[in-house]
Structures are given as structure tokens and as C-alpha cells.
Amino acid sequence: MATPHINAKDGAFAETVLMPGDPLRAKYIAETYLENAELVTDVRNMFGYTGFYKGQRVSVMGHGMGIPSCSIYTKELITEYGVKNIIRIGSCGAVRPDVKVRDVIIGMGACTDSKVNRMRFKDHDFAAIADFGLLRKAVTAAETLGIPVKVGNLFSADLFYSPDPQMFDVMEKFGILGVEMEAAGIYGVAAEYGANALAICTVSDHIKTGEQTSADERQNTFDDMMKIALDSVLLK
């Protein structure tokens, strides 16, 4: 049923939804990769589409920026539309010297400075991890496509403009592969409501070196990440 944030009809979404932060990236994926793609929701211009990829029904929808925004959309997709699998496909920043701009990262887990998972988990630490089945399929798809990936921890930050830049040194020490703003929240929502989740991110900028991609490139390219996510949906 429709919600305050999603105006799709019952059954409008496939069991698996790919979720970029940017709704225009969702539009790009639908127009570039999906056959018979249909716009199923557009509340607040947070576009969602359902179509077919190599014969497999799949949906793609934006989730906005930050854990509060993505938590709303993922929760409603799971509880109101019966979505089983959420695959975030987004951008992240790198802090380690061995992680380069445009590298693809698969988030095995996600640390965070947000308190939302503690609120969900009765003020205890919750290990926000990806579903192993989705993770394994993504790695297999990447290997089949010949696309190198890095698998490990992400850090989901509440603030884009950090007041504590020294924290990036701590992240580097602890082996964090990428800094973004949603994965830990999505993993928490999926765990709470019995769904599966995975985050695949492309490095859009390097926090230490200052190298970065353009806004247009972030919106309309990063195709390796998209191909991995889409091909992983085909695997059993």
C-alpha cells in the first residue's frame, strides 16, 4: 500500500531493489540497463522504477542522503511492499593509500558514529553486517565480470562535513575501506525487519589526497558497480 513517502501500488516492486542515494542515478540505471522499465513512485522526486534485467524482474529506487532518509525508504519497502533484498549502490570516500578513486568496495560490515542502531538494539552495540548470500553473489558477479573489488568495512558517518578530521586517521588505522552515510543504517533496518542487505560503493573521492570525481560522473557513470549489483541478482 502507498505510504507518505512511496506512492507505488501493491506489487509494484520486485523482491530485490537496487538503491542509489541519488534518484537521478536510479533514473539512469532504469533507462540504461532495464527493459520495460516503469516509473512506480515519484514522491518528492525520489524516483523508483521496476523493469527487467536479462529476464529477471528488478527494481531501482533512490534513498536520499544519510541514515534517517534511507531508513525511511528501506523500512517501508520491506514492511509495506514485501521487498526481500536491498542492495545499496552508492559513492564513498577513501582514507587508505591503497584504495583509489573509482575502486569498487563491497561492504562486509559498516561502522558508524550514528546512534540509530543502538536505539534499535536497546543501547547495545549492534554488528551491522551484510547478508552473506548477497555478499557472496556480488563477489562472484565481480569475478565473472573481471572487475576487481575490495571487500571489508565501511564507515557510515552522520555528518558529511566532519568536525573531527583526525578521525580519518583512526579509520585508516582500523582498515576502513570507504566512508559514506547509509550502509550501517540499511544493515540495521534489514536486520530489524527480517530482510537482506548489501552495500556496494564506488570511491568518488579520496579524503586524504583530495582527488575527486565530478558530480556528473557520480550521477551518470560508476557502471562497474551497477553491473556487479545487477548481475548478482541473476545468481541463485
Swiss-Prot record:
GO MF term (any one): purine-nucleoside phosphorylase activity
Catalytic residues (positions): D205
Important for catalytic activity (site feature) positions: R218
Task performed by this protein: Catalyzes the reversible phosphorolytic breakdown of the N-glycosidic bond in the beta-(deoxy)ribonucleoside molecules, with the formation of the corresponding free purine bases and pentose-1-phosphate.
GO biological process, one term: purine nucleoside catabolic process
Enzyme class: transferase
Subunit: Homohexamer; trimer of homodimers.
CDD domains, A to Z: PNP_EcPNPI-like
InterPro entries: DeoD-type, Nucleoside_phosphorylase_CS, Nucleoside_phosphorylase_d, Nucleoside_phosphorylase_sf
Family affiliation: Belongs to the PNP/UDP phosphorylase family.
Residues annotated to bind a purine D-ribonucleoside: H5, E180, M181, E182, S204, D205
SS bond list: none
Protein name: Purine nucleoside phosphorylase DeoD-type
EC number: 2.4.2.1
Cellular component aspect of the GO annotation: cytosol
Reaction(s) the record says it catalyses: a purine D-ribonucleoside + phosphate = a purine nucleobase + alpha-D-ribose 1-phosphate; a purine 2'-deoxy-D-ribonucleoside + phosphate = a purine nucleobase + 2-deoxy-alpha-D-ribose 1-phosphate
Amino-acid positions noted as binding phosphate in the UniProt annotation, renumbered to this chain: G21, R25, R44, R88, I89, G90, S91
UniProt keyword list: Glycosyltransferase, Transferase
Record flagged with keyword Glycosyltransferase: yes
Keyword Hydrolase annotated: no
Alphabetical list of SUPFAM superfamilies matching this protein: Purine and uridine phosphorylases
